[in-house]
Amino acid sequence: MAKFEGYLEKQKSRQQYFVYPLLFQEYIYAFAHDYVLNGSEPVEIIGCNNKKFSSLLVKRLIIRMYQQNFWINSVNHSNQDRLLDHSNHFFSEFYSQILSEGFAIVVEIPFSLGQLSCPEEKEIPKFQNLRSIHSIFPFLEDKFLHLHYLSHIEIPYPIHFEILVRLLEXRIQDVPSLHLLRFFLNYYSIWNSLITSMKSVFLLKKENKRLFRFLYNSYVSEYEFFLLFLPKQSSCLRLTSSGTFLQRIHFSVKMEHFGVMYPGFSRKTIWFFMDPLMHYVRYQGKAIFASKGTFFLKKKWKSYLVNFPQYPSSSWTQPQRIRLNQLTRSCFDFLGYFSSVPINTFLVRNQMLENFFLIDTRMRKFDTTAPATPLIGSLSKAQFCTGLGHPISKPIWTDLSDWDILDRFGRICRNLFHYHSGSSKKRTLYRLKYILRLSCARTLARKHKSTVRTFMQRLGSVFLEEFFTEEEQVFSLMFAKTTHFSFHGSHSERIWYLDIIRIDDLVNPLTLN
């Protein structure tokens, strides 16, 4: 680690970060190996057969990298293998995996150095990186009640791999590293099509998650640059930090390219996009823009988002990916919830002296519900039920012990209730609970080669009822002796937890196998 920091200190004074020589250092691949083992979530290495890290193999890899035609032979060999034998990736399974992981770590160095060089970001509290996903919804409830229009944005995906390389050219001045990145991307792009297919993107995401996340986050960061820079224009002009100054230069370059294609567009026109009450939220490939401005202003924003980001990165957003709706008349899917801001009407009886009259009061309410159809579809994809929601057994779990089967089903049920605790209607959650409970009973009955009724009579339903205890009931038992805290009979109580740092697997269909 000391060698790694020493190299960075030497290169920091040159204002250019030559990260390519780090690929010839053995400790880089040790970092990559430690990252795979100590990751925050399970990482599946495809095709490596769980091979352990070997310093001898890494030394052989570094020696081969010094050969003149190493990269050309490797890529040509990998393209031939993909046409003949899909199980033989690159020229060696271990070399391809460990090299791509090491490259993913090396290419992140200029970005990490840029963050450390900003004095404003040195003393950021660590807890900000552990904010719960549920903390977003109280923010939406506090802000969206006073806004008028909502824009649903789907970030363009997939894109051509060459666009990703061009986006990194402004931040990585190391030309050999960019060429090596092209080698890796051409390796994952099977047919070298003009538009990257979902198959090659899925292959890259599955074989090298770190590299995929780095490229995707870089692309999203470039896309968000146009979304967030304009609302901060008035404040950025008063700042003198180097980071903000570089952003303004980058924005001016974009403006020059945009002015060539649209001669009638001037810099003064950009000030018409200013909106002091604008809020932006994004998760994965979806983004939400909420504003209090007029409908005409939102249409100008849509035109800006469609045309402006494509210069000079050639990243074009299709108009149908941006939907503009009135906030009180739209429902948006976000983080596994169907959210809306309906207007509820209340009749209030007032009395003035001897006269009685009714006042029609209209009030906005931020409503969040758990979607039934997508969740049942996720359970069906995970083979817990049919497409219509009828519970079925889980054959691949019949080799486990009874306690392991109960533990897995119980954990899934508790996670669903925990993640969707902010739903105002619990009917969908009770339906999912019924599906998982009956699927668990059928799995156990299939294991013991008996019917569900016979198995339940022998085991008893009390054990399952105690196993699937809801968290609301646990809270009511904890606070029963001290205060009145009961959820019995209440199906509209919403609870937002502060310990949820990742989306539930059943909510996110991309994580299901």
Swiss-Prot record:
It is found in: Plastid, Chloroplast. One of its GO terms (biological process) is RNA splicing. Disulfide bonds: none annotated. It comes from the Eukaryota. Keywords: Chloroplast, mRNA processing, Plastid, RNA-binding, tRNA processing. GO terms for molecular function: RNA binding. InterPro entries: Domain_X, Maturase_MatK, Maturase_MatK_N. Its main location: plastid. GO terms for cellular component: chloroplast. Usually encoded in the trnK tRNA gene intron. Probably assists in splicing its own and other chloroplast group II introns. PANTHER family: MATURASE K (PTHR34811:SF1). HAMAP family: MatK. Belongs to the intron maturase 2 family. MatK subfamily. This is Maturase K. The gene is matK.
